[in-house]
Regions:
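Hydrophobic alpha-helical connector segments
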Residues: 73-104, 155-158
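Hydrophobic alpha-helical bundle segments that form small-molecule/ligand-binding pockets
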Residues: 79, 118-120, 130-155, 192-197
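N-terminal intrinsically disordered/low-complexity leader segments
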Residues: 1-8, 193-197
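All-alpha amphipathic helical-bundle segments outside canonical DNA-binding/catalytic cores
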Residues: 84, 124-125, 143-159, 173-176
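Amphipathic alpha-helical segments used for helix-helix packing
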Residues: 57, 84-88, 99-124
Length: 197
């Protein structure tokens, strides 16, 4: 069992992997670059991740997903109106994308694109992350009076729109797509739950 220093080294590698995956994907990130950027000792990678880069990816996906979830939760709780709450989440994501000079996308999507066809463990970690975020959106809509089925479907549509907006934003180097998603959320979610669903 690693001591405090070992846990700190492992945590640095996981966090660094999340940043690198976000900017350059799983395939574009090498172990040596990870060690160099994290400042981890050369022999420490396989000590902490005997399953190799895939094991690291599972840990980095979980870590990144939890960090993003915390930001989502803060925004969802900051507004009484669900449309304003979800719009604020999208605004936060757009600001983060712009701050990264459109180099940083969703770390979970980046890893999914690179690994889904070849690693069930990494794919499962990515799916869990997306399902968690969808669950946060769904729970917020449920608190606003949406039925379970309607909230679940709307949360899935919102998540898909956000992920698509990030991709379009990186390609166009602007936040127009995400701004459109935020506007749509604000205008269609509103404070009233849908009549059917």
């Amino acid at each position: 069992m690693p001591g405090d220093k070992g846990r700190a080294t492992r945590a640095r590698m996981v966090q660094t992997a999340g940043v690198l995956f976000r900017r350059q994907g799983y395939d574009g990130t090498g172990v040596q670059e990870l060690l160099d950027r994290s400042g981890a000792p050369r022999g420490s990678f396989y000590f902490h991740f005997p399953g190799g880069k895939q094991e690291l990816a599972v840990a980095a996906v979980a870590d990144s997903a939890m960090g993003i979830a915390k930001g989502i939760e803060v925004m969802l709780e900051a507004h009484d109106d669900p449309g304003q709450a979800v719009g604020a989440v999208v605004d936060l994501i757009a600001a983060d994308l712009e701050r990264s000079d459109f180099r940083g996308g969703c770390p979970i999507a980046a890893v999914t694109h690179d690994t889904a066809a070849r690693s069930d463990e990494v794919r499962a970690a990515c799916r869990t992350a997306f399902e968690h975020w969808q669950g946060l959106l769904e729970a917020r809509l449920r608190r606003a009076g949406w039925s379970l089925a309607a909230a679940r479907q709307e949360a899935l549509v919102i998540l898909a729109a956000i992920e698509g907006g990030i991709t379009l934003g990186r390609a166009a180097r602007d936040t127009e797509a995400l701004a459109a998603v935020a506007r749509r959320c604000r205008s269609t979610l509103g404070s009233a739950a849908p009549a059917v669903g």
